[in-house]
Amino acid sequence: MNKSTWIWEERHDKAREKLIKVCHEALEKKDFQRHYYGKNKTHCNRASEYIAKQCGSNTAWMHYKYWKWLKRKGKLGCVMTANSICRRAPEIVGEEITRVDQNQAHFCAWLGYPVLLCAHAIKGNRSGHVAIVYPTPQSSFLQVCNIGWNNRICSPGDNKSFGGGAGYLSAWSFYLLKTGDL
């Protein structure tokens, strides 16, 4: 299969519908609200892990941890990083995609081909974005749910609010996939 070609089957549509439902349910849970907005230092970790476990699968679930932000500069921040979550697909080898721009860190990882979970964090800001993304033939990627600073969810296909944070990395990572540079 050519890396610039996506195969669309009924099971992919069903998977997307399930992700949308799960993410909406997750945002309604007080447990998630408490983890995400709590003063506990691990709130960033717990919220992201909660979403990943709910939206993921037995073969590709995520565990987040804190790590030193740009260690060579001695800076610390709330950074979400994946640990042993990459899933191999026949067409594309899904590896963790990490990018650091100035004081921001981003990554995407497979929840199960072709669905990605992308995260974004800013140094010195205890909040971040987590987004479930799913490619579409029209736009190459689709934001299924975006959990951000105000706990807002974007409607499926709402690419107008897909410009920052996890959305930026999603576009970047899919660009690499489609151009064969990954």
Predicted regions span which residues?
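N-terminal capping segments
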Residues: 1-83
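...with weaker cross-activation on analogous glycine-rich loops/strands in unrelated enzymes
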Residues: 64-153
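Active-site or metal-binding loop neighborhoods of secreted/extracellular toxin and effector enzymes
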Residues: 4, 14, 127, 133-182
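Sequence-level detector for tyrosine residue identity
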Residues: 36-37, 50, 64-66, 113, ...
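Generic ordered-secondary-structure signal
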Residues: 20-25, 30-31, 49, 103-105, ...
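Low-complexity, compositionally biased segments
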Residues: 16, 27, 34, 48, ...
